[in-house]
């Protein structure tokens, strides 16, 4: 969500790698790297950032480079932000590795093809004392990327909603932080529900939890903040 750009006053750098169906050949992986920072210009607060994503699955590869901006302001006792991003998409297919029963089938390329297209995303974000929520739309232009002279790939608009709440009992070092992410691309719907338990005491911060996505996966994770760097597995 580009509206979340600059939501913290510190420079924020994020990197993550996820493998798909470990142990399977050409199962693919996803990687994202992102950096953003908040800027105070007079009495107004802004956020700027950049991100790069690479998603590979089988013969296909999807890359996106984004420049993000968000405008922040106070609203209803919380912090509201509106953001947008300019995106460059690159879609590619490794046709030279395709194992086809009919090598002359014109529906499948037999060489490596790639194509690029400009795109855009936008979103809103609201954070209160104990809860937050955001709504975003990706691929606003719903671009059709040309792959060579005879092939093309349609990129559908994607909508996502995120929300979360922090529950901290009085005089406790522990916080229970449930959250959810909902995604819809006009055809498929996916929900990821997470329960995270956080321990914070002075400069120590440790956490662990589980994420459940119906019909997709169950993921466990642990992590902590060490010398200002958040690491998780």
Model-derived segments and their meaning:
Residues 1-233:
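Subset of outer-membrane beta-barrel
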């Amino acid at each position: 969500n580009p509206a979340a750009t600059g939501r913290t006053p510190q420079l924020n750098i994020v990197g993550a790698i996820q493998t798909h169906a470990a142990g399977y050949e050409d199962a693919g992986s996803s990687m994202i790297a992102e950096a953003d920072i908040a800027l105070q210009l007079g009495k107004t607060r802004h956020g700027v950032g950049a991100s790069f994503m690479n998603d590979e699955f089988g013969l296909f590869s999807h890359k996106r480079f984004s420049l993000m901006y968000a405008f922040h302001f106070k609203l209803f006792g919380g912090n509201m932000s509106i953001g947008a991003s300019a995106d460059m998409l690159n879609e590619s297919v490794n046709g030279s590795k395709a194992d086809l029963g009919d090598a002359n089938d014109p529906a499948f390329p037999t060489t490596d093809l790639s194509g690029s297209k400009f795109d855009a995303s936008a979103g809103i974000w609201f954070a209160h004392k104990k809860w937050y929520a955001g709504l975003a739309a990706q691929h606003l232009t719903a671009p059709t990327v040309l792959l060579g002279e005879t092939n093309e790939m349609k990129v559908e608009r994607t909508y996502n909603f995120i929300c979360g709440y922090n529950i901290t009992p009085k005089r406790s070092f522990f916080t229970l932080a449930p959250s959810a992410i909902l995604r819809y691309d006009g055809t498929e719907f996916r929900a990821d529900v997470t329960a995270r338990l956080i321990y914070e005491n002075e400069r120590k911060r440790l956490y662990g939890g589980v994420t459940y996505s119906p019909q997709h996966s169950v993921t466990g994770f642990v992590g902590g903040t060490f010398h200002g760097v958040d690491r998780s597995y």
